[in-house]
């Protein structure tokens, strides 16, 4: 098991990563001044609960903690105000106090929702991220927590850093292929925005999703977390370079909102968004990434590589203008100058509409 420290401008917290990391949770809690008898409130979903909730709850109860749990539906649609309110109600019914700790046991949806509950319950209590998906290697680090709104993804939220991240990689063994693929999109994103050598390693070593196991999977998680942590250390509140982590997310979030949360996985939407960002980058900077055959590469893993035929460019543009990076209704996208080098660029509506239409006609800019 690997232990390291995540640093931000306002906080440091431990990351435990590896097979069996969950077993260190009681020791970790004691080190965080959470003695036996502290109330722990586990938020998980109905996909993870049958697999791991009893195991984690029993381990904590054996360490003499007062353990409660609340189960939400699985899927992106669960990041709703109704589920947020229900979690708050359950926390109040369990009489959580300001010394209590919320544990987010699940993927990115659970982590985002549970973190936002923690950020706002009694004006903020502590929480621990326990990711069970590959996607959550990105969302569990950095302290961005939120719920969705029909008009936009992650629009209601906060910056609230966890007390710790406990990433037991044995949890990934039960991950469905589609969810593994979804998480791998964020791995690819980290390589493209910050690390050309990692990108080249991915191209050479992860030919298919079947290669994403064992040491290769752990390496992907470590590299992704290292890249994310270095950016968060430099820009915790997303005033500058942290926006680079939104590569592929401007169109990706628009697709998720327009199609209905859960129609595409987050990673599937981001994959299409990254291909579009490359497509726009080629036209804006006047150079070609054709030799990289990005669409062909993405398709090899089973990602969708073109816009769904049911979406309209003008509707997507309106969603993109509601993105958190936008200023005064002007879309700002993270674009690729070269592998490992990105920048945020303002784009005019008419150009974006034309490029969306062209991208759709070309089937993902192949």
Swiss-Prot record:
Catalytic activity entry: 7-phospho-2-dehydro-3-deoxy-D-arabino-heptonate = 3-dehydroquinate + phosphate
Signal sequence annotation? none
MF terms (GO), sorted A to Z: 3-dehydroquinate synthase activity; metal ion binding; nucleotide binding
Q: Mind listing the GO biological process terms from this record?
A: amino acid biosynthetic process; aromatic amino acid family biosynthetic process; chorismate biosynthetic process
Q: Look up the domain of life of the source.
A: Bacteria
Q: Which GO terms describe its cellular component?
A: cytoplasm
Subcellular localization is given as: Cytoplasm
Query: Which residues does NAD(+) bind?
Result: 74-79, 108-112, 132-133, 144, 153, 171-174
Necessary cofactors:
Co(2+); Zn(2+); NAD(+)
Query: Which residues of this UniProt protein bind Zn(2+)?
Result: 186, 249, 266
Q: Provide the alphabetized UniProt keywords.
A: Amino-acid biosynthesis, Aromatic amino acid biosynthesis, Cobalt, Cytoplasm, Lyase, Metal-binding, NAD, Nucleotide-binding, Zinc
Pathway involvement? Answer: Metabolic intermediate biosynthesis; chorismate biosynthesis; chorismate from D-erythrose 4-phosphate and phosphoenolpyruvate: step 2/7
**InterPro entries associated with the record:** Dehydroquinate_synthase, DHQ_synth_AroB, DHQ_synth_fam, DHQS/DOIS_N, DHQS_C
Q: State how the cofactor is bound.
A: Binds 1 divalent metal cation per subunit. Can use either Co(2+) or Zn(2+).
Tell me which EC number(s) this protein carries.
Answer: 4.2.3.4
Quote the HAMAP family the UniProt record gives: DHQ_synthase
To which protein family does this belong?
Belongs to the sugar phosphate cyclases superfamily. Dehydroquinate synthase family.
Q: What does this protein do?
A: Catalyzes the conversion of 3-deoxy-D-arabino-heptulosonate 7-phosphate (DAHP) to dehydroquinate (DHQ).
The name under which this protein is listed is: 3-dehydroquinate synthase
Query: Which species is this record about?
Result: Geobacillus thermodenitrificans (strain NG80-2)
